[in-house]
C-alpha cells in the first residue's frame, strides 16, 4: 500500500535465555535420531527419553503401509483402462477424419 511504512523487525527479547550447551547437545542427538531413523517405534522411544515430554497420539498411530489394498488397485486399473479406451477411440476418429480429408485432396 502506498504511503505505508514498512514494519520493523520484532525487538530482541532480553529475558529469553540461551540453552546451556549440554541441553543443546541433547536436543541435537534426539533430533538426529528422529530424522535418521524415521519410524513410529523409534520416535516414541526417543520421546520417552525426553524429560517432561509425553508422546503424542499421532506418533502412536501406525504409519500407512506402502502397499495398496488390492481392491483400490483393481479400481484404479479399471479407471485407467476406461481412460485408455476413450483416448483410443478419439485417436481412431481423428485418423478416420484425416483419411477422409486426404482422399478429397
From Swiss-Prot:
* Gene expressing this chain: Pmaip1
Similarity annotation: Belongs to the PMAIP1 family.
Instruction: Give start-end ranges for motif BH3 1.
Output: 27-35
Listed Pfam families: PMAIP1
Mind telling me what this protein is named? Phorbol-12-myristate-13-acetate-induced protein 1
Query: Annotated region Required for mitochondrial location: where?
Result: 92-101
GO biological process annotations for this chain's record?
A: apoptotic process; cellular response to glucose starvation; cellular response to hypoxia; defense response to virus; DNA damage response; fibroblast apoptotic process; intrinsic apoptotic signaling pathway; intrinsic apoptotic signaling pathway by p53 class mediator
Task: Give the record's keywords alphabetically.
Answer: Apoptosis, Mitochondrion, Repeat
- Disordered, as annotated region: 50-72
Amino acid at each position: 500500500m502506498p504511503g505505508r511504512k514498512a514494519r520493523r523487525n520484532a525487538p530482541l527479547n532480553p529475558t529469553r535465555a540461551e540453552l546451556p550447551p549440554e541441553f543443546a547437545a541433547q536436543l541435537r542427538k534426539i533430533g538426529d535420531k528422529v530424522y535418521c531413523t524415521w519410524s513410529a517405534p523409534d520416535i516414541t522411544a526417543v520421546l520417552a527419553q525426553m524429560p517432561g515430554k509425553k508422546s503424542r497420539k499421532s506418533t502412536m498411530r501406525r504409519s500407512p503401509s506402502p502397499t495398496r489394498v488390492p481392491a483400490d488397485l483393481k479400481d484404479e486399473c479399471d479407471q485407467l483402462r476406461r481412460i485408455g479406451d476413450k483416448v483410443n477411440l478419439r485417436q481412431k476418429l481423428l485418423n478416420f477424419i484425416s483419411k477422409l480429408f486426404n482422399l478429397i485432396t
